[in-house]
Amino acid sequence: MAMKRFPLEKYATLELNHVEFARTGNLIAQTPLGAEFTAEAPCENGMWVCADRSKGVVASIEDVNEPIGVVYTAEKEYDMYHYGLKHFGRKVAGDYPRVGILEKGDTMTTNCLQYDDGEFADEETLYEALAAWQTTPVYVVPVVGSPVPQLTATKPTEGTFGKVCKFYTVPNGERGVKYQITNI
């Protein structure tokens, strides 16, 4: 059993559908990325990170009950032929991402996800489960030690988690998942 990333071309994409932090200003923008974010493992939009400002850096989640935020740094237009979206990653330690602290009811669409191949054997099995979200719930949960949230059919009992409410595409045309935060 191993964790596998949701298929994407380069970097993950995020679309904020309805989020409270945009209205309330409950966000982090002046805290640098921790040392775990490198050129080989950059910080991407849609990642869930620890939203505890007292730690001094944006880092992976250490406890599912700590405040959790989603990275939503604005994509860049590199030039008139190369737009951000799937080609944009916040990159490495020392950079300052924008992180919105999740609230119950927040809804977003992303392909920044991972799954356990012990639960979903392959991409096709995962896609079948996501397509049946109306009859068989699929949840989005934090992963201790990883900034990439996980898709699972097992309903969590604590901490922040969301529920899939649509399986379609992200703004760059790749497959994606729309989910709503249902528990904080």
Model regions and ranges:
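Surface-exposed, low-hydrophobicity beta-strand/loop segments enriched in small/polar/acidic residues
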Residues: M1-I184
